[in-house]
């Protein structure tokens, strides 16, 4: 056989093999399968009573296991209209949530066992997205005067609303924190930092946030948002990046304290501020 004939046969066989592989891919993921389908979770408002006392809240988020992507904000609100704690959500979210008090901690978690049945998912749905019709779709409401020491949102964006006095420790897994209509003595973020802190119609006397693997932007919507003193701390992490970005151009902060850690790997700090902000470098 001529050389050109061999080449033509090779091209034909190669095309045949590629066509077979393509068909196998189509068969393994047919059009009928919903890959990354978005489920909008909503329904009428529902309020669930919480009878046992607590001083900390943990959103025990076990949903990010590679199979589900759940997008809903977690809010904690202080209110004069309730005499006991409760959880406000929607009818469809309520079917997916469990609440339990252990010691001084209220645990709010997704009940993944009910997920497929409640949403009537097809068994072959791949990596579905659950999106809340209301952005802050899950809210724990506590009576005014109740002491709340800590909130751990895990994978959730966290909002504090209508707090009047007191100090709160807030932990998120590198998710944004929003403060709305609050007057607080202090907000402490103990471990992982937050990429964004939004302060709206609120005054916070003292904020402490670590700056390590994430940059930080602080945003005050207008003059009604004020942080009197904010301390940004470096971290002792080998894997932390050498350069940190601290954007305070839209923040109303009276005094900024930068406290690098003794072995802080954030060697260069890119800082953007407003005029008139006092800056203190607290070398430890």
Positions of predicted regions on the chain:
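Right-handed parallel beta-helix
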Residues: 92, 96-190, 194-199, 206, ...
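Extracellular beta-helix/beta-solenoid repeat scaffolds
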Residues: 64-66, 77-92, 145-147, 166-169, ...
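Short, surface-exposed interaction patches in beta-rich subdomains
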Residues: 198-284
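Beta-strand secondary-structure signal
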Residues: 56-58, 107, 139, 169, ...
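Flexible, charged surface loops at secondary-structure boundaries
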Residues: 49-53, 80, 142, 181, ...
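Short acidic/polar N-terminal linker immediately downstream of export determinants
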Residues: 2-12, 19-94, 113-142, 154-159
């Amino acid at each position: 056989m001529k050389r050109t004939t061999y080449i033509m046969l090779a091209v034909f066989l190669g095309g045949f093999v590629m066509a077979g592989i393509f068909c196998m891919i189509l068969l393994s993921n047919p059009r009928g399968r919903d890959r990354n389908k978005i489920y909008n979770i909503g329904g009428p408002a529902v309020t669930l009573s919480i009878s046992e006392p607590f001083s900390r809240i943990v959103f025990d988020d076990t949903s990010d296991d590679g199979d589900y992507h759940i997008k809903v904000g977690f809010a904690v609100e202080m209110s004069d209209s309730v005499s006991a704690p409760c959880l406000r959500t929607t009818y469809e979210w309520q079917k997916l949530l469990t609440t339990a008090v252990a010691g001084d901690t209220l645990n709010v978690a997704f009940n993944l066992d009910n997920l497929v049945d409640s949403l009537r998912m097809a068994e072959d749905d791949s990596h579905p997205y659950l999106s809340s019709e209301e952005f802050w779709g899950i809210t724990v409401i506590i009576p005014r005067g109740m002491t709340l020491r800590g909130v751990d949102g895990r994978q959730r964006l966290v909002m504090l609303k209508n707090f009047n006095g007191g100090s709160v420790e807030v932990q998120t897994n590198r998710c944004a924190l929003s403060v709305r209509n609050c007057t607080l003595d202090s907000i402490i973020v103990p471990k992982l930092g937050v990429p964004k802190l939004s302060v709206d119609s609120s005054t916070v006397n003292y904020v402490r946030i670590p700056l390590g693997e994430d940059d930080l932007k602080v945003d005050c919507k207008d003059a009604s948002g004020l942080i009197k003193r904010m301390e940004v701390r470096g971290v002792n992490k080998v894997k932390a990046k050498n350069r940190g970005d601290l954007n305070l151009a839209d923040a109303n902060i009276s005094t900024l304290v930068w406290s690098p850690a003794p072995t802080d790997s954030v060697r260069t700090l890119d800082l953007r501020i407003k005029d008139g902000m006092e800056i203190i470098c607290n070398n430890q």
